[in-house]
Amino acid sequence: MKRRIASIILAGAMMASLTACGSSGGAGQNAGGKTGDGAKANELTVWCWDPAFNIYAMEEAAKVYQKDHPDFKLNVVETPWADVQTKLTTAATSKNLDTLPDILLMLDNAYQKNVISYPDAFKDLTGNGVDFSKFPTAKTAYSVVDGKNYGVPFDNGAAIAAYRTDVLKEAGYTDADFTDITWSKYQSMGEDILAKTGKPLLSCTAGESDLIMIMLQSAGGSLFDKDGNPSMVGNDKLKKVIETYVSLVKSGVLVEVNDWDQYVGTMTNSTVAGTINGCWIMASIQTAEDQSGNWAITNIPKLEGVSDATNYSNNGGSSWAVTAGSKNPELAADFLSKTFAGSVPFYETILPKSGALATYLPAADSKVYGEPQAFFGGKPVYAQITEFASKVPSNNTGVYYYEARDAVATAITHVVSGADIDSEIKTAEDTVKFAMGK
């Protein structure tokens, strides 16, 4: 997940300073949450990161809310995700929840671990004015524990397949040929394109599991069962994913690189003819301004011979949590319900400058989301991606999600080098069980 947060903003916003702190009206920023009786009835404190993306969105949300609540004040404290996690853990384990802000931003894949581990640290938002039906089920599922909603969804991590249309044309293909296809069809066409142009279709960072998890979730697969227990051995979907990945590598259609910078470079330097990742990768693609008009977006390939296989998945994203330390939990819930969970104009405002693509489904019908994007062949890609998000299958992340991802990534590395798939899957599951103390 390296540099995922930095990569989510679009090209124009990527050049913005990442050092400034944001606040919207009223009180200045401070290093932590509220203290003692200092909280005011019309004031909220928020922890989040990235001035050009998350902080900017919060500032604009405050402006929207202030139209009907002119005395409302929002203090945004720029806090990197790693620090949010550390401070949250410290506050929860020390039972000192007053050190937390009213609202904090949490990575979707970290929700289950934090809410299950620290159930007293978060407010249940179910029945607090947020209409969760306005968001994709797969998105809200990240922050639902025991049937209760603990997060208001924000940014979109819907998976996309992006292709260099000029390279496809050189080999006799169009992006339409890559829409609603299977991975075997993808590999077959990829081998043909490689032979004709010398360019692989796909690249990824060796030793990371993002593509594996995208494939797995596209069929509703998980590394854990519904009770949070490791479910890798005997997991037909996982085995199919690994087999597919290894086949792509051995065919030359997928090329592995050493790090994130090299991965981005394969696209911007025209080494590969496409990529498959969360939609935030569009920001990195668009840094190659000379390629404008030569990219197209469509859905991802699906697995064959697997139940519930789809052409849709997810990678990344985050949601807003209201903490149990909030002195104004009703205000926090109302603020989120009127902005991130209730305002299409808000999302229309933040999209052009930050590239903050919503998971709020009504936004997909707005004129702004439907505007053609010259870089991507004049297609309305934002509306397209929002539609993709509505079709993503849910999966079980579990408390030990990141440990499981790492174990699977190690297994993949070994299998690509010739190790037995079943043995590596068992080793991965044993590794997670050990981490869980089982």
Where are these regions (language model features)?
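Short, low-complexity disordered leader/linker segments with a strong preference
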Residues: 1-45, 67, 423-426, 430-438
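Short, well-ordered beta-strand elements
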Residues: 39-51, 72-77, 102-103, 150
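Extracytoplasmic "Venus flytrap"/periplasmic binding protein-like
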Residues: 64-136, 170-172, 271-274, 288-289
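Short helix-initiation/N-cap motifs at beta->coil->alpha
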Residues: 78-90, 181-187, 256-269
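Hinge/lid segment of periplasmic solute-binding proteins
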Residues: 105-160, 185-189, 214, 296-299, ...
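C-terminal lobe and pocket-closing loops
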Residues: 114, 281-292, 304-407
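Extracytoplasmic/periplasmic solute-binding protein
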Residues: 146-154, 159, 169, 184-231, ...
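Glycine-centered hinge/linker elements that transmit conformational signals in sensory
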Residues: 187-192, 228-257, 300
